[in-house]
């Protein structure tokens, strides 16, 4: 009986931090994109270090083919951020994976990017819930610069889109 009580207490005390961290940071070291809340969390050791509101593809999630205007779901590598005249910074998501290619998925130029740079009149579009062609957009230049600097400082960084 004493062993059961100790086991029960241990499972209660030690499962709470694991569960709490896994809800916001299932990828404990990387970028976690939560499509239901439209948030991007940068996580280190299972702890959120920064959160940003995001916009996703205007046709929803579950990208399978080029031009479907959906945001892909899954775990992907991130390429080196690059300067973009259109979005300030563009961070390529390595979509599709080799497994997805083998399953017939198509598409390219999916990434995490900043607000449109066309005109300050159009920056509000990036704050709409589903305003991209399948990418993940943050609404402010300083936000994408923060994400890009984090990716540069963490070579081999990944993004989990769920």
Functional labels for PLM-detected ranges:
Residues 1-7:
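Bacterial N-terminal signal peptides that target proteins for export
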Residues 51-53, 75, 109:
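Well-ordered beta-strand positions in beta-sheet-rich domains
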Residues 23-60:
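A structural motif detector for short, solvent-exposed N-terminal "entry" segments of globular domains
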């Amino acid at each position: 009986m004493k062993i059961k009580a100790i086991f029960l207490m241990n499972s209660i005390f030690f499962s709470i931090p694991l569960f709490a961290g896994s809800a916001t940071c299932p990828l404990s070291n990387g970028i976690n994109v939560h499509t239901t809340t439209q948030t991007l969390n940068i996580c280190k050791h299972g702890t959120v270090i920064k959160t940003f509101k995001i916009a996703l593809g205007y046709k929803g999630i579950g990208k399978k083919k080029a031009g479907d205007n959906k945001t892909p779901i899954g775990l992907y590598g991130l390429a080196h951020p690059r300067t973009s005249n259109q979005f300030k910074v563009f961070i390529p998501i390595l979509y599709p994976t080799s497994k997805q290619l083998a399953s017939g998925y198509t598409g390219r130029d999916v990434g995490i990017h900043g607000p449109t740079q066309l005109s300050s009149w159009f920056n509000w579009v990036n704050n709409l819930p589903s305003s991209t062609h399948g990418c993940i957009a943050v609404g402010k230049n300083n936000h994408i610069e923060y994400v890009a600097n984090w990716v540069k400082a963490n070579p081999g960084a990944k993004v989990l889109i769920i």
